Amino acid sequence: MQFREGTVFDLRSDVFKLVSAMKRLIFAALVTAALPLAACSKDFDNSTVKEFDLSRYLGEWYEVARYNHSFECGMDNTMAQYILQDDGKVVVLNTGWKDGKFKLAEGKAKYPDPADDPGHLRVSFFLFFYSDYNVMMVDENYQISLVGSKAEKYLWILSRTPVPDPDLLDMVLDEAAKRGYDTSKLIWVDQSRNIEALESAD
C-alpha cells in the first residue's frame, strides 16, 4: 500500500479532530445531565408552619393578593371558605367575580400528615387531581395567612377581612420576601363588591 505525501499528517489531524469532537460531546452530556439537578435546587422556601390548628383555619378568607395564574385570571372579589364535614373531610368553596357575575368552584381538601406536617394540605377541584396547599405563615390570631404551593409561581395572601390590618399585611409581605418570593409580582385583588356586601349587611 502506498501513501501519498502528507497522508500520515492528514490521519493525525483527523484523529485529533475526532478526539476533540468526542471531548465536546462528553462535556455537553455532562452539562445536560447536571441540568435536572440544578432545576431541583430551588431558590425559594415554601416550607409549611410547624404549628397549625386546622379548626382555627376553617371559615372564610378573603384573597388580598396573589400571583397571576390562569385559573383566576381576570377574577376579583375572590374569597375561599373551608368547611369541615362530619366525616372529617374539608369542603373548599371558592368564589369570585368575573364576566359580570359571581362564580363558584367547589373542591375538597385532604390533610395528609397532620402530625408531622400540619401546615400542608392537598386541594382538588377536579376529580382526583390534587395540588399542594402550603400554609407558610399564619398569625397567632389566624387573621392573615401566606399560602404557597409546590412551584414558586403560586402565592396567595389571605385575610379574614377584605382589607387586612396594615401591620399584619407588612408582616406577611416581609415573610414572603424572606422566603425568596418576588412581592412586586403580586396582583392586589379588588374586594369592593365584598366590602359593599358586608356594609349592607350591617
What is each residue range found by the language model?
Residues 8-21:
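Short, Lys/Arg-enriched N-terminal segments with co-localized hydrophobic residues
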Residues 40-202:
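A beta-rich soluble binding module of mature secreted/lumenal proteins
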Residues 25-34:
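Sec-dependent N-terminal signal peptides
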Residues 23-26, 43-44:
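Hydrophobic alpha-helical segments with strong N-terminal bias
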